[in-house]
Amino acid sequence: MPELRALLTDAGFADVQTYVQSGNVVLSTGVSANRVGGKCEKLIAERFGFEVDVIVRSRDELAEVVRLNPLADVADNPKRYQVSFLDGEPAPEVVEQIAAAAAPSERLVAIGRELYAWHPDGVGRSKMWTKLAGKGLGVRATARNWTTVTTLLEMAGES
């Protein structure tokens, strides 16, 4: 991720930090989230030769995701608790279809542009995850486990 960090720093973003190898970036900027996402997508495509969907949340938005934590009463393993960050609100019928694929022990809560999903038996065994990871959401999405979500918020507090 040093190359990504350097690319974004050279493009004028400040306080650029990366976390693990899955494209998590925390940075400071004075421009809107939409402009940040579009600029990052363009820079990555030009530099690395592939297209990625960049989903952006401000520090305050990420703090709200953590504060809401609608599955805190059941999600006791942060690696099996995921938040899907969407670029728009999913249609209610899409959320219903995803929830219908859930095992009895799984949970799904949609709040705005986030889907909170609890997979107590692991993501690899989840039919609900197959639906969440597919293209059927009708919006662009990226998912992170709870450990990553809270770590990114901690990092954002430092920038």
Which positions does each model-derived feature cover?
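Surface-exposed, charge/polar-rich loops and edge strands
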Residues: M1-S159
